[in-house]
């Protein structure tokens, strides 16, 4: 009757690839679908059972490794069969989506694309976007997630006419400025007006060099934060181009997915181009890391351990971006 995808994948190609590039989840370099299939194969935990399927399972894994075509990274019929968005017309259940805007494992596009597919087909659907990463939010203080979930399940599983469709907003987005504030809208993006920012190049040249050695990145130590700070804050470097807007005079909310269009010529046979949107300015920002604020504050029911209420941690010192 209903499904509740939390940090869920809607297109397996988009999880492991990006426009022909191998792009696994952050922290999982080298991962691919055959490795995940092996990792999740619970029958290997039972030696007697596993022995009965070992050869067939090994052949099946070899087939996945060949079909995923890691060498080319191309989208294929095999990947197309694992794109749930292509099967949206066959969805029958209502959907309650939950995803973290800072999820670098399963990126938020998986959630947003599935919501759009459901919405366009008139399938009852809700979407809740929080400021965390690849997590569950049943213990996120102030989210009221458990209350809404009970309301939703009572309606769809028990047929109770409790006004769940009207009482739960179609879209809830947690503010990155105040984690107790959830912005509600009937759809996504929340359209209340649009102003296109004017981009001003921080340097005149439109040429860049794809050369990691030109950066401060050091393979021998963990200095990713230093590399990112140089990339964002340094005004001129050969390996990147920066474009900045005029200072924002009023509070501005970006709703939806930012799109970047450009034309580029490349002197090499291959190259990696990426873009990111950055907020500049000294501020103590919300982080995706969580901290316990009330130990044992969640009673789950009789004879069950108490849960801890958590919140997202605020930076102790202002950051530049």
Task: Describe every region a protein language model picked out.
Residues 139, 143-321:
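C-terminal, loop-rich substrate-recognition/catalytic regions characterized by aromatic stacking residues
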Residues 104-110:
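Conserved alpha/beta-hydrolase "acid-adjacent" motif
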Residues 75, 132-142:
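Active-site rim elements
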Residues 2, 92-95, 122-126:
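Loop/turn elements at helix/coil->beta-strand transitions in domains of secreted/extracellular proteins
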Residues 2-90:
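Accessory cap/linker subdomain of secreted extracellular hydrolases
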Residues 91, 97-99, 103:
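Short beta-strand/loop motif that positions the catalytic acidic residue
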Residues 118-135:
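Catalytic histidine neighborhood in serine/cysteine hydrolases
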Residues 9-12, 102-104, 134-135:
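Solvent-exposed loop/turn segments at secondary-structure junctions
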């Amino acid at each position: 009757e209903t499904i509740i995808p939390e940090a869920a994948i809607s297109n397996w190609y988009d999880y492991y690839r990006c426009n022909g590039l191998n792009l696994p989840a952050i922290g999982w370099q080298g991962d691919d679908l055959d490795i995940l299939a092996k990792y999740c194969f619970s029958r290997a935990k039972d030696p007697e059972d596993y022995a009965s399927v070992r050869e067939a399972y090994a052949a099946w894994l070899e087939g996945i490794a060949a079909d995923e075509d890691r060498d080319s990274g191309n989208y294929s019929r095999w990947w197309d069969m694992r794109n749930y968005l292509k099967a949206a017309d066959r969805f029958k259940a209502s959907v309650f989506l939950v995803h973290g805007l800072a999820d670098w494992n399963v990126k938020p596009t998986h959630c947003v694309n599935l919501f759009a597919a459901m919405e366009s087909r008139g399938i009852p659907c809700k979407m809740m976007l929080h400021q965390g990463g690849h997590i569950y939010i049943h213990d996120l203080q102030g989210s009221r997630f458990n209350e809404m979930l009970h309301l939703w399940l009572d309606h769809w599983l028990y047929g109770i006419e409790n006004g769940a469709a009207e009482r739960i907003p179609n879209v809830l987005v947690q503010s990155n400025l105040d984690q107790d504030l959830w912005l509600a809208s009937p759809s996504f993006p929340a359209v209340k007006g649009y102003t296109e920012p004017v981009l001003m190049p921080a340097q005149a040249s439109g040429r860049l060099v794809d050369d990691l050695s030109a950066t401060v990145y050091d393979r021998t130590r963990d200095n990713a934060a230093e590399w990112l700070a140089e990339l964002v804050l340094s005004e001129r470097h050969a390996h990147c181009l920066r474009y900045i807007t005029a200072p924002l005079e009023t509070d501005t909310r970006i709703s939806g997915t930012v799109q970047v269009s450009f034309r580029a010529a490349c002197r090499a046979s291959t190259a990696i181009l990426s873009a990111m949107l950055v907020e500049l300015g000294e501020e103590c920002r919300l982080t995706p890391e969580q901290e316990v604020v009330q130990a044992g504050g969640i009673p789950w029911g009789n004879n069950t351990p108490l849960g801890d209420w958590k919140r997202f941690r605020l930076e102790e010192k202002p950051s530049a971006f």
